[in-house]
């Protein structure tokens, strides 16, 4: 009887690849953020890990059909009582209509747009739902979708991005003198 040869099992080569993740920035429970495309600057935003989608306060939200048949939404950001209100109407040709849970757990149908948020001098293009937040303290809500893999929240602090922005302005001003 001839001997039976079994193949030698070779375990797969283990390669320890450490993915270089960008360092997460620490932000506070509130931050002053910019929306350059919407001409809104230093708007106070609430950081909310309980919310998945971020929200922007706007008024006069309406869907309209143009002469060419295209659907658009038009709105104004903030409201007349807000110091950053500029009264300018914005039009968006690219948008979605989604069901989003509000802070009371009720599902609301909201328009969602893509725009650029600037925080810590980093521009993040992301989605925001449009909502009338006039009765709420903060006109902007930053949810987990933006926070994930980018930021850590220190609830004892606030406006860390703005403080860094102000410090950088002072440095530039000193250098130019």
Segments the model singles out, each with a brief description of its role:
Residues 2-177:
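Pepsin/retropepsin-fold aspartyl endopeptidases
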């Amino acid at each position: 009887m001839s001997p039976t040869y079994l193949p030698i099992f070779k375990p797969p080569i283990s390669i320890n690849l450490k993915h270089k993740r960008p360092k997460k920035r620490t932000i506070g429970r509130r931050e002053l953020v910019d929306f350059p495309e919407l001409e809104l600057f230093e708007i106070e935003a609430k950081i909310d890990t309980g919310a998945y989608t971020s929200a922007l306060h706007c008024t006069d939200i309406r869907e309209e059909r143009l002469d060419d048949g295209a659907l658009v939404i038009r709105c104004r950001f903030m409201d007349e009582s807000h110091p950053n209100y500029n009264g300018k109407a914005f039009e968006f040709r690219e948008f979605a209509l989604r069901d989003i849970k509000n802070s009371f757990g009720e599902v609301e149908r909201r328009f969602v747009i893509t725009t650029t948020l600037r925080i810590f001098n980093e521009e993040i293009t992301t989605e925001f739902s449009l909502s009338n937040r006039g009765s709420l303290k903060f006109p902007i809500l930053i949810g987990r979708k933006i926070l994930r893999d980018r930021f850590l929240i220190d609830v004892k602090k606030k406006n860390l991005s703005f403080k860094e922005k102000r410090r950088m302005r002072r440095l530039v001003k000193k250098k130019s003198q």
